[in-house]
């Protein structure tokens, strides 16, 4: 796995803004602004996170990668892992972009599927071009 040692451009997908980001903003009004800035700054320098327990590589197929990033909301006194807050992101080394596809608390996802099955379903059906780049139409991770 190779992540460029540069500052990436970080964006929230429209899907993440419409579906989950609003919940964080509403629930953590004052804390969220600081948290969002911290997330962007962390992911901007994602190469620094690659050897930590906060960033899990789901799939890497050069020059692309799909990662899960754990984060905590400022002022909650919870560790990023234990907070249950997650980001699923797409890294494009060629374009030097990090696209936040999903931002959620694990309890936000539908209960009839496991957490992994739920986000896989959302990525596959809402970001088909990204899915194809990483999996060539296969369901395997």
Q: Where on the chain are the PLM-derived regions?
A:
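Arg/Lys-rich, positively charged N-terminal/basic patches that mediate binding to nucleic acids
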Residues: 1-44, 129-141
């Amino acid at each position: 796995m190779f992540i460029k040692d540069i500052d990436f451009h970080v964006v929230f997908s429209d899907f993440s803004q419409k579906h989950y980001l609003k919940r964080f903003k509403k629930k953590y009004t004052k804390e969220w602004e600081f948290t969002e800035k911290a997330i962007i700054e962390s992911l901007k320098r994602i190469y620094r996170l690659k050897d930590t327990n906060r960033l899990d590589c789901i799939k890497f197929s050069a020059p692309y990668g799909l990662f899960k990033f754990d984060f905590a909301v400022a002022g909650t006194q919870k560790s990023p892992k234990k907070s249950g807050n997650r980001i699923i992101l797409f890294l494009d080394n060629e374009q030097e972009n990090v696209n936040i596809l999903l931002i959620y608390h694990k309890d936000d996802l539908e209960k009839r599927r496991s957490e992994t099955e739920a986000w896989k379903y959302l990525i596959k059906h809402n970001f088909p071009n990204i899915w194809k780049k990483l999996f060539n139409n296969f369901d395997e991770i």
